């Protein structure tokens, strides 16, 4: 049995295939942690966290630039200035505004500038309906009074949707308080985080002077949506083609809640000898600046390996549970800052001929803290997240390694992470989308926790092999050009319906990905693919991502293979329908 395990020592943990002369069986990625389903799960989890981030705020400039004016014949000497009713302006701001206009001879334009500056100070804080005015007064004493009417929010009106608890969860505590645009934007973001919502906001006059109401328009979005699709992003050993089905329930409790369930399965099996399946369930409920979220994922893989004249059944099961909260802590004209914290428990089980392999099976608990920034900068939209993942030795963790050495997998470590997603328009109607992920671990991890490079969800141009490492980074780049613009179906004549469903919104895109991994420790027994390396891939594709019917096809090729074997051209497809 020892010789069998030695031959399979690089396969059961689902590591990358080493160089062909390394003595490893000539197979691709096997079952268990590290399979394509594991990469798909990580991709989905990252995408879900990205979808939870609010979009960057408007870059509108609220503050007016102070203007210098010289004394004129029609001016009045102002020796002192008070701003009355400005309870939401700090004493320092009031003092700064007063100092700007005292000790000067002010004309009519200067008085208007003073009012603009007071209004601008309110608008900079989001109080867009508060107004400053000059009451009737005598300026013979040299004292100037500015009075502020702080605009109050009297209520909300919902059109197209039932009010239910929407005000309570999206705009808690705003009624009968000074109107703050930042809080309204936050509530609108909580509504529009639901995939099929596109709520619009309008501020309208209230029933009394100095008051306003907010009208929310949202065409009836429906409660249940879903999509079904197929692709060939799976492993050849466990099922290259896979089918996917997802159901999404939105606002079913009236709490702007969102729930989703997904089931995936390999489309081509082999009488139970090989196959893969994946199940996930996610949910989130907001409350003002807070959002509570959770998720559960499970995947199974099985395939058979022939080596040393014997047939062996390899199996793997992974489960992942996550629960946490996020909060928007800052919102201004630069961007939006969000903090997240969550607990995660991941378990993985590898078997050989249905016998559990203790050294390749474990439970790992984590505590994760993240800070994200959504902003408009450099001519584009950017989402940046810094995270810190702490592997803990309690609250669910179990491992066969009681006193792990440097080369053994650890359960207690610290792993900083970095994620960047950017969208930048380019000349000639091009759009550049870049995605960066990097991580560094202070200890060697189980392979299911290590960075995996090579595949449709990381560095494209690879499928059967990948790199693993405790440290590394990768970048994905798409440059797209939409050639079938919305409305083009009107030029299709009798085929207008076909064009609208299958062509409208289609785009060509180019692919350029790259990445690197490092083991993070030294060991003579490591195969090249586990020591680390640099890989890159490029390709071309055509896709349609909008509308009820979506599809994607691309062809990629490695341009830097590092220690990985040659795979040639890789063709990928995806097609599905939304409802």
Located regions from the model:
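Residues that define the transmembrane beta-barrel architecture of outer-membrane proteins
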Residues: 210, 239-243, 275-279, 317-321, ...
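C-terminal transmembrane beta-barrel domains of outer membrane proteins
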Residues: 404-579
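Extracellular loop and loop/strand-boundary signature of outer-membrane beta-barrel proteins
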Residues: 231-233, 266-269, 306-312, 349-359, ...
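Transmembrane beta-strand segments of outer-membrane beta-barrel domains in Gram-negative
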Residues: 286, 291-447
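Transmembrane beta-barrel strands of outer-membrane/channel proteins
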Residues: 203, 228-232, 245, 259-265, ...
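Periplasmic polypeptide-binding modules associated with outer-membrane biogenesis and secretion
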Residues: 19-234, 246, 264-277, 416, ...
């Amino acid at each position: 049995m020892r010789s069998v395990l030695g031959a399979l020592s690089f396969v059961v943990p689902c590591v990358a295939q080493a160089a062909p002369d390394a003595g490893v069986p000539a197979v691709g990625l096997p079952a268990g942690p590290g399979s394509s389903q594991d990469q798909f799960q990580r991709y989905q989890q990252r995408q879900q966290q990205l979808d939870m981030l609010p979009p960057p705020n408007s870059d509108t400039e609220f503050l007016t630039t102070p203007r210098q004016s010289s004394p004129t014949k029609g001016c009045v000497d102002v020796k002192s200035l008070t701003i009355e009713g400005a309870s939401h302006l700090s004493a320092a701001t009031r003092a700064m505004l007063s100092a700007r206009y005292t000790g000067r001879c002010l004309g009519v334009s200067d008085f208007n500038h003073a009012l603009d500056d007071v209004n601008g100070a309110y608008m900079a804080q989001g109080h867009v309906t508060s107004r400053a005015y000059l009451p009737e007064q005598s300026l013979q004493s040299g004292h100037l009074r500015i009075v502020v009417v702080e605009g109050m929010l009297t209520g909300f009106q919902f059109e197209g949707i039932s009010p239910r608890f929407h005000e309570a969860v999206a705009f808690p505590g705003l009624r009968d308080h000074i109107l703050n645009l930042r809080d309204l934007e936050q509530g609108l973001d909580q509504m529009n985080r639901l995939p099929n919502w596109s709520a619009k906001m309008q501020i309208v006059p209230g029933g009394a002077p100095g008051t306003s109401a907010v009208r929310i328009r949202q065409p009836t979005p429906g409660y249940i949506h879903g999509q079904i699709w197929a692709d060939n992003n799976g492993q050849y050993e466990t099922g290259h083609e896979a089918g996917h089905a997802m159901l999404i329930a939105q606002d079913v409790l009236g709490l702007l809640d969102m729930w989703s369930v997904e089931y995936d399965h390999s489309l081509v099996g082999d009488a139970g000898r090989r196959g893969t399946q994946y199940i996930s369930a996610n949910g989130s409920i907001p409350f003002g600046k807070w959002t509570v979220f959770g998720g559960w994922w499970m995947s199974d893989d099985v395939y058979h390996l022939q080596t040393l004249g014997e047939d062996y059944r390899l199996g793997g099961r992974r489960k992942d549970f996550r629960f946490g909260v996020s909060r928007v802590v800052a919102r201004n004209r630069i961007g939006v800052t969000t903090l997240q914290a969550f607990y995660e428990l991941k378990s993985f089980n590898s078997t050989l001929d249905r016998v559990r392999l203790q050294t390749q099976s474990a439970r790992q608990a984590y505590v994760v803290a993240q800070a994200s920034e959504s902003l408009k900068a450099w001519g584009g939209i950017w989402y940046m997240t810094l995270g810190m993942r702490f592997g803990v030795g309690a609250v669910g963790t179990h491992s066969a390694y009681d006193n792990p050495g440097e080369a053994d997998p650890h359960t207690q470590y610290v792993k900083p992470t970095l994620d960047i997603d950017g969208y930048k328009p380019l000349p000639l109607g091009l759009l550049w989308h870049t995605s960066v992920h990097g991580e560094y671990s202070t200890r060697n991890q189980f392979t299911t926790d290590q960075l995996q490079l090579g595949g449709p969800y990381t560095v494209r141009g690879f499928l059967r092999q990948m790199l693993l490492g405790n440290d590394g980074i990768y970048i994905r780049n798409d440059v797209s050009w939409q050639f079938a613009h919305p409305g083009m179906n009107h030029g299709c004549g009798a085929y207008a319906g076909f064009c609208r469903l299958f062509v409208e919104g289609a785009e060509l895109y180019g692919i350029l990905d790259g990445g690197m991994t490092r083991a993070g420790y030294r060991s003579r027994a490591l195969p090249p693919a586990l020591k680390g390396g640099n890989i890159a891939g490029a390709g071309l594709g055509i896709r349609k991502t909008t509308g009820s019917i979506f599809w994607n096809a691309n062809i990629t090729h490695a341009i830097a293979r590092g220690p990985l074997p040659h795979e040639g051209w890789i063709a990928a497809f995806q097609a599905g329908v939304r409802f």
